[in-house]
A protein has these predicted regions:
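Collagenous Gly-X-Y triple-helix signature in extracellular proteins
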Residues: 1-184
């Protein structure tokens, strides 16, 4: 799999001393994301719910507990835990913070604005602000890919990036692409 640098000094470190001593910015140096998606599609949850938001979804657990373990050990040892924000789901506008090693991007981090998600889930990454493509492939074909953002006005959906690269949303038990990010 290929990864692209999507930002520098963008993500807030969960621990100010993640590099051994406090950093001047409190930010992770480099943020990366998969250029395309994993070859396997995943559901956010086995049922159509976004209750509990990103913090309570099955895919977050899979990323942290399974997929991270499949990365090269040299990578695992340098990945930093960062604080990511997302709404609490179930149409809540409350923004919660989560400590993550691997994460999905929020709608605003990709598009720079919110169409289907709650306000306050982060800021647009430089990679996307520069106009780079939002289309990602699963096994060579453009596909929908998951965001960590719960749908703001319904309790069954999470936000996705449509196969054409535009903002959309879909049922939480849909099986879509995963293009995770991480920081070093």
């Amino acid at each position: 799999y290929a990864f692209v640098i999507i930002g520098f000094n963008h993500d807030t470190l969960a621990s100010a001393t993640a590099y051994g001593s406090a950093t001047a910015t409190g930010k992770a140096g480099i943020s990366l994301q998969m250029k395309d998606c994993l070859n396997t599609t995943y559901q956010m949850n086995s049922s159509n719910t976004n209750s509990g938001g990103w913090g309570n979804c099955a895919l977050r657990t899979t990323l942290q507990n399974t997929i991270k373990g499949q990365l090269p050990s040299a990578w695992q040892s340098i990945i930093k835990t960062v604080t990511k924000k997302a709404s609490a789901g179930s149409t809540s506008s409350t923004i919660s913070s989560y400590s993550d090693t691997l994460f999905l991007l929020a709608e605003v981090e990709i598009f720079g604005s919110t169409t289907y998600s709650a306000v306050g889930e982060g800021d647009q990454y430089a990679w996307y602000k520069a106009g780079n493509s939002k289309v990602k492939k699963v096994n060579g074909s453009a596909n929908f890919w998951w965001e960590r953002s719960p749908f703001a006005t319904g309790s069954s959906y999470f936000c996705i990036v449509y196969s054409a690269g535009n903002a959309s949303s879909s049922y939480a038990n849909g099986s879509f692409g995963v293009a995770f990010g991480f920081c070093v």
